[in-house]
């Protein structure tokens, strides 16, 4: 039995009844039953208070009579269940990703203990995480979450412990974990778990789980660098993953001297909803600009859209990120298939939504300050009718009266008109229109989520699309332009292979070994590692950096397209024995093209959204100042 399979069997031993516990005792008399109840209630309250106090001391590292390194064993000991629950409540709200949750736990507790005690903690953590983040593929079964957490702990050890006697490739990790999950629930959503496990693997590979140090141990070395034990390589990969700074190199973004950035913790969708439920102010997702005060409360602008719509919700089954992160699979293709015109895989590929009208729900939606607010209504009265003046209600009244309320942060989202709106005639009898909002994969509880909204007309759909893309462009981090590791691996298009080295003989293709191309980071994986911090940039810097980034991506696309004819010429002129290598090389080329093109299309949408907002602001100023406009006409 493998370690992953044993995850389900690591439980505390069943309690045995002692002879004393098996003896029947006299039932209480009615005269003192109230006294017993009161004593029991008082004892329960005292127990809760004591458990909270002990949990707080463990969190602070000040619990007496228990060694700091024994806290986990103490929490997992039978009889300390209430203390464990209170300790985990101190970690609320839990991150929406399981790796983020484990990272938060191991940053708050010295998480080395006996297997049974660790298992008890993970079981309680699984229950709490699932109650806060009810992701569909977990089937409301905490045991599935428990298995994944245990698997990630094992993976963390094998990836970062030099003395470990085994190691997992990403394929082995996924296969072993899926097998363990299927033994618990045979009908699990394998594609969803595969995507999540792939992202978890890369997250832990880039940065191991922290090991909490006692309060007396310094967190920083004399050099000023944090002593996290990860080493320079891990830190370098993490910097590439987060891309929170504009590195001044030829392959990165260059900020102006006047650019401004503020580093803050990223507010997750779970945190936003937690704050809303508890009537706490939401965290700012952007830096205020002077024009925000003028336009942020003006409905029908890139700054604010608020209206009644119909909404459908769906999850993406596939995206190119999961394809790029998956293991290479050789496809059966004919040699000449690569000469066909390539079909662009853009961000505008639409999700399959159910056409049944019963799936539509009435909702008031509001896009404002980097967030999407959704108030769903089921109807009122016997006829289940929807009041016509909901759009005039205060937000607090909407929150109290709606059947369901949720707020979503717009990091990395893309809004687009549904294709049927674009091709429909303006004189058509169809008055309504639809638009989509797609959330990136790997981003907290919204991973792969997609909404379809039906508006009153096409103009309103366009306004919602522009507003969503404006805020996404403004708050989303811009990744590094470097898309692959600098290495000596051959993918099928290196200058050495296509042109030959100067003064040397042509490369023997029979001896060429092609590696599987994959990006330095997945299309959306940048968002999954942003629990620790994110840089907020002023508007001009974000706009300027988007221009630089899209230009760099465009240049890389042109450069990549230029090598394809050379590859075809090199490989196609050889005999049939080279066909497998030719197909592998073209598969690599295609994967890189899809990656670059998708990044380019997405950030081009962001760039246009910010530029259109600038034009809108300039027009609004000219309307507000007609005297200036008339004076300009007189001078001309």
Curated annotation (Swiss-Prot):
<protein>
    <recommendedName>
        <fullName>Guanine-nucleotide exchange factor YEL1</fullName>
    </recommendedName>
</protein>
<dbReference type="InterPro" id="IPR035999">
    <property type="entry name" value="Sec7_dom_sf"/>
</dbReference>
<keyword id="KW-0963">Cytoplasm</keyword>
<keyword id="KW-0472">Membrane</keyword>
<comment type="function">
    <text>Guanine nucleotide exchange factor for ARF3 required for localization of ARF3 to the bud neck and tip and involved in actin patch polarization.</text>
</comment>
<dbReference type="GO" id="GO:0005737">
    <property type="term" value="C:cytoplasm"/>
</dbReference>
<comment type="similarity">
    <text>Belongs to the YEL1 family.</text>
</comment>
<feature type="region of interest" description="Disordered">
    <location>
        <begin position="213"/>
        <end position="234"/>
    </location>
</feature>
<keyword id="KW-1003">Cell membrane</keyword>
<dbReference type="GO" id="GO:0005934">
    <property type="term" value="C:cellular bud tip"/>
</dbReference>
<dbReference type="GO" id="GO:0005085">
    <property type="term" value="F:guanyl-nucleotide exchange factor activity"/>
</dbReference>
<dbReference type="GO" id="GO:0005886">
    <property type="term" value="C:plasma membrane"/>
</dbReference>
<dbReference type="InterPro" id="IPR056468">
    <property type="entry name" value="PH_GEF_YEL1"/>
</dbReference>
<feature type="domain" description="PH">
    <location>
        <begin position="333"/>
        <end position="475"/>
    </location>
</feature>
<dbReference type="InterPro" id="IPR000904">
    <property type="entry name" value="Sec7_dom"/>
</dbReference>
<dbReference type="GO" id="GO:0005935">
    <property type="term" value="C:cellular bud neck"/>
</dbReference>
<feature type="domain" description="SEC7">
    <location>
        <begin position="1"/>
        <end position="203"/>
    </location>
</feature>
<keyword id="KW-0344">Guanine-nucleotide releasing factor</keyword>
<dbReference type="Pfam" id="PF23633">
    <property type="entry name" value="PH_GEF_YEL1"/>
</dbReference>
<dbReference type="InterPro" id="IPR023394">
    <property type="entry name" value="Sec7_C_sf"/>
</dbReference>
<feature type="region of interest" description="Disordered">
    <location>
        <begin position="1"/>
        <end position="29"/>
    </location>
</feature>
<dbReference type="Pfam" id="PF01369">
    <property type="entry name" value="Sec7"/>
</dbReference>
<dbReference type="GO" id="GO:0032012">
    <property type="term" value="P:regulation of ARF protein signal transduction"/>
</dbReference>
